[in-house]
């Protein structure tokens, strides 16, 4: 049998059998398929619109959540990077910063009445010293003047070049040469101390040298270079420092405001309100010219068209170079037009002229009243 199958497999086909296989197979069949069956197929294959809408909404929500998640990831990465940079910067600062000495706490120290004032500290801006209030009082007050307190003392009346002495004023003058623990802080505050006997009551004395001659006498005795002291004015028994030295130094600094090199004090120029053109112009006019000059002069020196028919004396013209510098400064600082600045100058001159006339009338009227009183 195996030999027969092998012969059949290896046998060659006839031509008529090959032609019969290549012809298509036609099947005549009768079926009972109706249109309802096709509708069912369409309903199964076609998706439900509501389900499609829900699927679309779910996909949108998924995309939104993915976007939010990505934003959170970016934010966290930025926060981590920033914190890492800050930690690195703080570590570098800590490495480069010199070691800070331990803070000295203020506390009360029991010292005998005959003890002298403590030696000056090494740091000229931080001062620790003691003041003994009475010979029988063992409690000493330890006062710490730091940089902040020194700045606050510089604005007070008794802060500049203040002397703190222990003992009577007459006895202090006699023992001034024997005092060895004297020093001066960089801003001018100094302290003199000397040991006193138990019989002499200790007093807290604040003295100021009012004249430059006394200052010159103190310099060779103390061998200390002190800055020049401003004038001190006494009111009701107390000394008040006017602090005019710094203001005069600021007033001596002049600022050029235009191409013609018209100069005004730097303190005045910095305090001008440049937001209003007219106010800035008036301030510069009053600073450069006096009020009498503004009252008797005008910007152009020509008569006003409004007073052509009236016989009024002509006013002299203000310095054109200074006027040009004022216009230059105001137009650049206030972003105003040249016409606005010129109108402000003309108005200021007219106002000063009116004020001068009113003052002259008041003076005449007061003079007439005095004459009548003298006659009566």
Curated annotation (Swiss-Prot):
Effect the entry attributes to changing residue 315 to A: Complete loss of DNA-binding
Effect of residue 342 to A: Complete loss of DNA-binding
Highest taxon in the source lineage: Eukaryota
InterPro entries: BEN_domain, BEND6-like
Protein keywords: Coiled coil, DNA-binding, Nucleus, Repressor, Transcription, Transcription regulation
Record keyword DNA-binding present: yes
Intracellular or extracellular location(s): Nucleus
Principal location: nucleus
An MF annotation (GO) of this entry: chromatin insulator sequence binding
Domain BEN: 258-356
Coiled coil: 50-79
A biological process from GO: positive regulation of neuron differentiation
Mutagenesis or variant effect for residue 354 to A: Significant loss of DNA-binding and transcriptional repressor activity. Complete loss of repressor activity
GO CC annotation terms, alphabetical: nucleus
PROSITE patterns: BEN (PS51457)
Pfam families with a match to the protein in the record: BEN
UniProt remark on domains: The BEN domain mediates DNA-binding.
Subunit structure: Homodimer. Interacts (via BEN domain) with Su(H). Interacts with Cp190.
PANTHER family xref list: BEN DOMAIN-CONTAINING PROTEIN 6 (PTHR35346:SF1)
Role noted for this protein: Can act as both a transcriptional repressor and corepressor. Represses the expression of genes involved in neural development and preferentially binds palindromic sequence 5'-CCAATTGG-3' to mediate transcriptional repression. Acts as a corepressor for suppressor of hairless (Su(H)) and inhibits Notch signaling during peripheral nervous system development.
Protein name, per record: Protein insensitive
């Amino acid at each position: 049998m195996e030999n027969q199958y092998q012969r059949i497999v290896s046998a060659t086909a006839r031509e008529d059998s090959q032609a019969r296989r290549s012809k298509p197979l036609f099947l005549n069949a009768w079926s009972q398929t109706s249109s309802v069956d096709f509708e069912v197929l369409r309903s199964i294959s076609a998706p439900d619109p509501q389900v499609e809408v829900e699927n679309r909404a779910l996909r949108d929500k998924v995309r939104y959540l993915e976007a939010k998640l990505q934003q959170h990831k970016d934010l966290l990465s930025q926060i981590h990077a920033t914190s890492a940079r800050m930690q690195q910067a703080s570590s570098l600062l800590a490495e480069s910063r010199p070691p800070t000495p331990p803070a000295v706490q203020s506390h009360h120290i029991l010292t005998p009445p005959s003890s002298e004032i403590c030696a000056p500290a090494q740091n000229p801006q931080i001062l620790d010293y003691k003041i003994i209030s009475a010979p029988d009082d063992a409690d000493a007050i330890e006062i710490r003047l730091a940089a902040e307190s020194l700045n606050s003392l510089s604005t007070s009346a008794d802060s500049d070049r203040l002397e703190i002495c222990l003992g009577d004023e007459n006895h202090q003058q006699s023992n001034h040469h024997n005092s060895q623990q004297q020093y001066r802080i960089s801003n001018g505050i100094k302290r003199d101390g000397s040991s006193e006997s138990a019989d002499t009551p200790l007093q807290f004395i604040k003295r100021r040298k009012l004249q430059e001659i006394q200052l010159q006498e103190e310099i060779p005795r103390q061998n200390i270079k002190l800055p020049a002291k401003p004038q001190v004015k006494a009111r009701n028994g107390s000394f008040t420092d006017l602090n005019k030295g710094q203001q005069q130094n600021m007033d001596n600094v002049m600022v050029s405001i235009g191409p013609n090199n018209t100069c005004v004090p730097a303190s005045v120029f910095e305090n001008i309100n440049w937001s209003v053109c007219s106010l800035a112009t008036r301030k510069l006019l009053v600073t450069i010219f006096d009020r009498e000059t503004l009252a008797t002069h005008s910007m152009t020196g020509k008569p006003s068209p409004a007073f052509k028919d009236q016989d009024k004396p002509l006013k002299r013209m203000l310095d054109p170079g200074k006027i040009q510098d004022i216009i230059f400064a105001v137009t650049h600082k206030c972003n105003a037009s040249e016409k606005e600045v010129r109108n402000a100058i003309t108005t200021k001159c007219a106002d000063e002229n009116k004020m001068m006339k009113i003052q002259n009338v008041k003076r005449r009227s007061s003079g007439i009243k005095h004459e009548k009183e003298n006659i009566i």
